[in-house]
Amino acid sequence: MKIIINKANESLKIDINRKLILPYAVGGLMYSPAIRTDIADMVITKKYKYLHSLAICLEDSIPDCSVEAAEKQLAETFRKLEKAAEYANIQDLPMLFVRVRSAEQLIRVYDSIKGSKLLTGFILPKFDTSNACEYINALKQLNTASRTVY
């Protein structure tokens, strides 16, 4: 990750280890229901100029009867974003997080987006002692098999 600081027409570029800065870098987080078909276009066209972090929600913004459709739309959103990043040289994409309902869904979603490099991490709702082990084990499984996902 590079940070560019502009001061009095001078630029200072600093390389920063993403893992060190990530806990402090999320900033304002925009939520969007995963069922929306315009998320990729919104990101690609930079509809929100200063969008830095985006949570694509599969949890309480999605009715139970629409979860499967929302998961399919999420996979399509990531497919479009991957294609744009590869072919249109789209840069400066926001950090992308997916808010899941369960540890099982976390793994299913990760597989459906084929471990997209555009995914920054997951938001684990209602995380507590009753589900902590399941979420942690799911993340360990992903992180063992691929790159680090937060």
Enumerate the predicted regions with their spans:
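Expand to "…catalyze enediolate/carbanion chemistry for C-C bond making/breaking, isomerization
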Residues: 1-150
